[in-house]
């Protein structure tokens, strides 16, 4: 074994490096990762602390209701109240009276035509010869 090499074929740049040991820069990264992980666990909220902090504070009554912001779009009074609350001008959609039937028929017709076109392309380009 040559001088300056701790393990045969080791070219990690460290004189006495052993494969089971981390190089010094990787040790620093591992230690800092362990410190950050431990620090994160210290800062994570615990159920005891969460319930203790929740006891002293009260949320507004309307936030606890199960139907908070759960209302149909047809309820214009609530829509206007929410728009006023968030400071926006409300948008009111009106029914124009035209039915979506024509557009629906055109769309379905185009899809059927596209399907038959792809089927035609497949059938004309497939080769039914044996062994081909």
Swiss-Prot record:
Q: Does the keyword DNA damage apply?
A: no
Q: What main location does UniProt list?
A: membrane
The protein's topology relative to the membrane is: Single-pass type I membrane protein
- Does the record bear Transport in its keywords? no
What is known about the tissue distribution of this protein? Testis-specific.
Report the GO terms under cellular component.
plasma membrane
Subcellular localization, as worded in the UniProt entry: Cell membrane
Protein's recorded name: Fertilization-influencing membrane protein
**Organism of origin:** Homo sapiens (Human)
Phylogenetic placement of the source organism: Eukaryota, Metazoa, Chordata, Craniata, Vertebrata
Identify the gene encoding this protein: FIMP
């Amino acid at each position: 074994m040559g001088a300056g090499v701790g393990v045969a074929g080791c070219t990690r740049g460290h004189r006495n490096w052993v494969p089971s040991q981390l190089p010094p820069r990787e040790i620093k990264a591992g230690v800092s990762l362990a410190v950050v992980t431990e620090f994160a666990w210290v800062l994570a909220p615990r159920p005891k602390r969460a319930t203790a902090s929740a006891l002293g504070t009260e949320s507004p009554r309307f936030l606890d209701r199960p139907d908070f912001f759960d209302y149909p779009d047809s309820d214009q009074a609530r829509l206007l109240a929410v728009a006023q609350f968030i400071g926006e001008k409300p948008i009111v959609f009106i029914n124009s009276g035209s039915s979506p039937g024509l557009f629906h028929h055109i769309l379905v017709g185009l899809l059927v035509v596209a399907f038959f076109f792809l089927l035609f392309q497949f059938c004309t380009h497939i080769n039914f010869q044996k062994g081909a």
